[in-house]
Amino acid sequence: KEFLFVPISSYSPSAFAFRVTSWSMKEGGILPGDIAIAEKEREPKDGDIVLSKAREGEGRMELRRLRIRGSLMELWPENDSMGITRSQNLEICGILTEIRRKY
Protein backbone atom coordinates (compact mmCIF):
# COMPACT_ATOMS: atom_id res chain seq x y z
CA LYS A 1 0.00 0.00 0.00
CA GLU A 2 0.99 3.57 -0.63
CA PHE A 3 -0.04 6.54 1.49
CA LEU A 4 -0.35 10.19 0.58
CA PHE A 5 0.10 12.53 3.52
CA VAL A 6 -1.40 16.00 3.20
CA PRO A 7 -2.21 18.71 5.76
CA ILE A 8 -5.82 18.12 6.80
CA SER A 9 -6.46 21.88 6.88
CA SER A 10 -5.84 22.02 3.11
CA TYR A 11 -9.05 20.16 2.27
CA SER A 12 -12.69 20.01 3.29
CA PRO A 13 -13.94 16.98 5.25
CA SER A 14 -15.62 15.74 2.05
CA ALA A 15 -12.34 15.50 0.09
CA PHE A 16 -11.09 12.13 -1.07
CA ALA A 17 -8.21 10.81 -3.17
CA PHE A 18 -8.10 8.12 -5.84
CA ARG A 19 -5.58 6.76 -8.31
CA VAL A 20 -6.25 7.54 -11.98
CA THR A 21 -6.42 4.34 -14.06
CA SER A 22 -7.62 5.59 -17.46
CA TRP A 23 -6.08 7.48 -20.37
CA SER A 24 -9.34 9.48 -20.80
CA MET A 25 -7.78 12.80 -19.71
CA LYS A 26 -4.25 12.40 -21.13
CA GLU A 27 -4.45 15.48 -23.35
CA GLY A 28 -5.36 17.47 -20.23
CA GLY A 29 -2.19 16.22 -18.54
CA ILE A 30 -3.90 13.67 -16.26
CA LEU A 31 -2.27 10.24 -16.61
CA PRO A 32 -2.73 6.72 -15.23
CA GLY A 33 -0.95 6.46 -11.89
CA ASP A 34 -1.64 10.09 -10.92
CA ILE A 35 -3.33 10.72 -7.58
CA ALA A 36 -6.48 12.81 -8.01
CA ILE A 37 -8.03 14.74 -5.14
CA ALA A 38 -11.71 15.57 -5.41
CA GLU A 39 -14.37 17.32 -3.33
CA LYS A 40 -17.75 15.66 -2.79
CA GLU A 41 -19.66 18.64 -1.42
CA ARG A 42 -19.04 21.19 -4.19
CA GLU A 43 -21.76 21.89 -6.74
CA PRO A 44 -20.51 20.91 -10.23
CA LYS A 45 -20.29 23.64 -12.85
CA ASP A 46 -20.02 23.50 -16.61
CA GLY A 47 -16.36 22.92 -17.49
CA ASP A 48 -15.36 21.21 -14.21
CA ILE A 49 -13.43 17.94 -14.33
CA VAL A 50 -15.58 15.45 -12.43
CA LEU A 51 -15.57 11.86 -11.23
CA SER A 52 -18.95 10.40 -12.22
CA LYS A 53 -20.90 7.20 -12.74
CA ALA A 54 -24.31 6.13 -13.99
CA ARG A 55 -26.92 6.32 -11.22
CA GLU A 56 -28.33 2.86 -11.83
CA GLY A 57 -26.27 -0.20 -11.02
CA GLU A 58 -22.58 -0.49 -10.30
CA GLY A 59 -21.36 1.52 -13.26
CA ARG A 60 -17.73 2.29 -13.93
CA MET A 61 -16.49 5.62 -12.62
CA GLU A 62 -15.14 8.08 -15.17
CA LEU A 63 -12.93 11.15 -14.84
CA ARG A 64 -14.09 13.58 -17.54
CA ARG A 65 -14.83 17.24 -18.25
CA LEU A 66 -18.46 18.12 -17.54
CA ARG A 67 -20.58 20.02 -20.05
CA ILE A 68 -24.14 20.89 -18.97
CA ARG A 69 -26.71 21.31 -21.75
CA GLY A 70 -30.07 22.01 -20.06
CA SER A 71 -31.04 18.78 -18.27
CA LEU A 72 -28.45 16.78 -20.23
CA MET A 73 -24.96 16.20 -18.84
CA GLU A 74 -22.11 15.45 -21.22
CA LEU A 75 -18.82 13.95 -20.08
CA TRP A 76 -16.01 14.88 -22.45
CA PRO A 77 -12.72 12.97 -22.39
CA GLU A 78 -9.53 14.81 -23.18
CA ASN A 79 -8.42 11.98 -25.42
CA ASP A 80 -9.45 12.07 -29.09
CA SER A 81 -9.74 8.27 -29.27
CA MET A 82 -12.56 8.15 -26.67
CA GLY A 83 -16.21 9.09 -27.06
CA ILE A 84 -18.44 11.55 -25.25
CA THR A 85 -20.91 10.20 -22.65
CA ARG A 86 -24.34 11.89 -22.68
CA SER A 87 -26.95 11.23 -20.01
CA GLN A 88 -29.61 12.72 -17.78
CA ASN A 89 -28.91 10.01 -15.23
CA LEU A 90 -25.35 10.59 -13.99
CA GLU A 91 -24.15 10.82 -10.43
CA ILE A 92 -21.32 13.31 -9.86
CA CYS A 93 -19.16 11.72 -7.16
CA GLY A 94 -16.63 14.53 -6.86
CA ILE A 95 -15.13 17.64 -8.46
CA LEU A 96 -11.41 17.42 -9.23
CA THR A 97 -9.36 19.93 -7.23
CA GLU A 98 -5.80 18.65 -7.52
CA ILE A 99 -3.55 16.15 -9.31
CA ARG A 100 -0.37 14.77 -7.74
CA ARG A 101 2.24 12.81 -9.62
CA LYS A 102 5.23 10.94 -8.28
CA TYR A 103 8.34 10.98 -10.48
Where are the language model's segments positioned?
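Acidic/glycine-rich C-terminal interaction modules and beta/coil loop segments
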Residues: 2-103
